[in-house]
Regions:
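Extracytoplasmic metal-acquisition and chelation regions
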Residues: 1-244
Length: 244
């Protein structure tokens, strides 16, 4: 809390993403400026799903629809939304530190250019792919991503915050989907043991690849200096394989 109180700028994606941040965003913390990225972008975030304690017995394909006007809270998984996030943060930095505004703007332009290239890469992968469906063996944080690139998806669990294990019937249905659609690759999430993916691969002969949500990184990843762009470019290569 002391660090928060001494901060010139306190940033969050949105209240419905970092539900724990409400107290930190109370003006009594004394931080200099408060930046709610989603609000500044004019986005209304859907409530972040809570953990489910029970195993799931249905795979999820476009099952959960948000209230009209709301978007999934994981906005950074969409490279176009990510560009908006960079612009909002840059504007805040320029207000706080106008002396270095040109420095921030220059770096922002360079980074946004890289995000635009990333977006173009995903569009190319989808345009040249043999299929338009991807399969996730665990939790799912890519609704904005799949909507941006007009991809269908099947996921074993319907929420990123869901820590339950998919049930046997769910796994069996996904195995059938992989076989029927000739899916070459299924995805698993970072920082988890891909047990479900291993089962599906064992039954179908498909490969499994990491599709990183860029939500958290391991200590090794952090120490190696990975960032959003490197993780998403890895996702791009894995997506090309999955759509081949």
């Amino acid at each position: 809390m002391k660090a928060v109180g001494n901060a010139d700028l306190l940033i969050r994606v949105g209240e419905n993403m970092e539900t724990w941040s409400a107290k930190l965003f109370d003006k009594s913390t004394g931080a200099g400026e408060y930046l709610d990225i989603a609000s500044e972008m004019g986005l209304r975030l859907a409530a972040h799903e809570h953990e489910n304690e029970h195993g799931h017995e249905d795979e999820h394909e476009h099952e959960h629809e948000y209230e009209e006007g709301f978007v999934d809270a994981h906005i950074w998984t969409d490279p176009v939304y990510a560009q908006g996030m960079v612009k909002v943060i840059t504007d805040a930095l320029c207000r706080l530190d106008s002396r270095n505004a040109e420095f921030y703007k220059s770096n922002s332009e360079k980074y946004i250019s890289k995000l635009q290239s990333l977006d173009a890469g995903f569009k190319d992968a989808v345009r040249n792919g043999k299929r338009d469906i991807i399969v996730f063996s665990g939790r799912f944080a890519f609704r904005n991503f799949t909507e941006r690139y007009s991809l269908k998806f099947v996921s074993a669990l319907d929420a990123c915050a869901d820590n339950s294990e998919p049930g046997a019937r769910t796994v069996a249905k996904i195995i059938d989907t992989v076989k029927n659609e000739n899916i070459p690759v299924i995805f698993y999430e970072e920082l988890t043991e891909p047990r479900t993916a291993e089962i599906i691969c064992g039954e179908t002969g498909c490969s499994m690849r990491l599709f990183h949500s860029c939500h958290n990184v391991s200590r090794d990843e952090f120490e190696s200096g990975v960032g959003y762009l490197s993780l998403m470019n890895d996702n791009l290569q894995n997506l090309r394989e999955a759509l081949s």
